[in-house]
Regions:
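Extreme N-terminal basic, low-complexity initiation segments
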Residues: 2-7
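Class I S-adenosyl-L-methionine
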Residues: 8-10, 14-236
């Protein structure tokens, strides 16, 4: 069957008679990427099924392990109020995205990513990671840790919490990454202002939000590799 990875000699000979090359086998999905952009870093990867906003990741019901990036705006420091804007929302009002992502990781295995200090951890009874390394997060077989995305190519340090279940837990680069400051802004305004401004805000310009929110490809590959160990455990 073409597209299933199961193509016998007769099928291959059929294409030869037509003077055409047989299409390459399509790798069946082994991981689902939830709450990601349709044209983002997870798009068109072999064995990865993308669930974006249009597809509504909340509808995912398995069976593959997941990499989940549920929206974080309603769980952060400014979930309800921003000093420059005023009232902006209600804490936890994310239309059930985090709850579904947590359920999917616990049910099918995989890993979930959220910013450090995400209030979703306390909301859902997860123990926050306090030191380097994986730690037990709950009574459902989940583990959590803190990493910094600068170790994987992000422009900023971007400390991040991970939650994983039913997968192998790799040793990762723990601890703080090297601080990066915009050299021109640092020279003009001094360390404290440059630190508060951040490298992404100064270097990113109009693209600063996109750059800040982007998942570096090395981190994407790491998260997929973690999730795939869940698929191996399921097959064992």
């Amino acid at each position: 069957l073409v597209g299933s990875g199961l193509m016998d000699a007769g099928t291959a000979n059929f294409f030869e008679l037509l003077g055409a090359s047989a299409p390459a086998p399509v790798e069946p999905p082994s991981v689902a990427a939830l709450y990601v952009e349709a044209d983002g870093v997870y798009a068109n990867l072999p064995g990865v099924e993308v669930y974006d906003r249009q597809r509504d990741a909340r509808r995912y019901r398995g069976p593959h392990p997941v990499v989940a990036h549920p929206p974080c705006s309603r769980w952060g420091r400014y979930a309800e109020y921003h000093p420059m804007v005023g009232d902006i929302g209600v804490l936890g009002d994310d239309d059930g995205c985090f709850a579904h992502a947590l359920w999917a990781v616990r049910s099918f295995g995989g890993v979930l990513e959220h910013p450090k200090e995400s209030q979703a951890w306390a909301w859902f009874g997860l123990m926050p990671p306090l030191t380097g390394g994986w730690q037990r997060a709950d009574d459902f077989g989940g583990y959590t840790c803190c990493i910094e995305q600068c170790h994987y190519g992000h422009a900023a340090r971007k400390p991040t919490w991970l939650y994983a279940a039913k997968v192998e837990l790799p040793s990762l680069p723990w601890g703080r990454g090297k601080q990066r400051l915009h050299e021109g802004y640092l020279a003009k305004h001094g360390y404290e202002k440059a630190r508060r401004a951040g490298i992404v805000a100064m270097a990113g310009g109009k693209d600063k939000v996109r750059i800040r929110e982007a998942t570096p490809e090395p981190l994407r590959d790491l998260l997929i590799s973690i999730a795939r160990t869940g698929a191996r455990e399921e097959a064992a």
